Regions:
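Cytosolic regulatory regions built on CNB/CRP/Popeye-like sensor folds
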Residues: 1-134
Length: 134
């Protein structure tokens, strides 16, 4: 989880204890290139931490694919509508290379937000930064 931890700590100084709790609640998965880890029209309640590889968020409309976001090593990605509103995702997330990804269910991440102030602050600042980039 070296890339993920480095990126987390670039955003906020999360303690070793909190990072250990985060890692204990994650599952390691491997996805081959060209895999849709989130599919439009499907509700997905997972947060994906990219340790190795690259993925893109893509919006499908009228037979056209529009890339809206790239997720690099150390970054997180998720279906926004699914995660925030428990509705089917309007975008898909596709791996552009073979990927090593840690996943965590949003309920577990919310539990960590409630337990560890530094994880909650990291999440808040992360979302502020993403919204600023939009």
């Amino acid at each position: 989880m070296e890339n993920i931890i480095q990126k987390i700590r670039e955003i906020y100084p999360v303690s070793d204890e909190a990072l250990q709790a985060l890692q204990a609640n994650m599952e390691l998965r491997y996805y081959p290139k060209d895999t849709y880890i989130v599919q439009s029209g499907v509700t997905d309640r997972l947060v994906y931490f990219i340790e190795e590889g690259i993925a893109r968020s893509v919006f499908h409309h009228n037979g056209q694919d529009t890339t809206t976001w790239f997720t690099l090593e150390g970054d997180i990605t998720f279906g926004m509508d699914s995660l925030y509103y428990q509705q089917p995702s309007v975008e898909s997330i596709e791996t552009l290379s073979d990927c090593k990804i840690y996943v965590i269910h949003i309920d577990k991440l919310n539990m960590l937000y409630e337990t560890y102030l530094d994880i909650a602050n990291w999440g808040r600042i992360l979302h502020q930064n993403v919204n600023k980039e939009l």
